[in-house]
Amino acid sequence: MAEIVWSNPALDQLEEIADYIALDKPQSAAELVKKIFSTVERLGQFPNSGHALPEIPDSIYREVCVRPCRIFYRQENDVVLIIHVMREEMQLRKFLLDVDLIS
């Protein structure tokens, strides 16, 4: 089973999204965060269950979607590294994944 590791930027991005949703719907924000963590935890057993990125099909990155979010990750040996979280309606820029986001 792979270990799940969240980068600090990914956690910050998730927190920003949840804080924004919580302004109007605190319960919905809490449920979203819970569902995202649950979905990401399953990657520990099934790291290849995410999808290739349509914007960068030949990259090492994959994604899982929990509406309204996209969660980007890559697998390194026995580690699934969560590197970026964004809302679905935002456009992914290739340069975001070219930067080492681990801090």
Where do the PLM segments sit?
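Basic, Lys/Arg-enriched alpha-helical interface segments
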Residues: 2-60, 101-103
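Enriched for short, Lys/Arg-rich terminal
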Residues: 66-69, 74-103
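Short acidic-hydrophobic surface loop/beta-edge motif
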Residues: 62-64
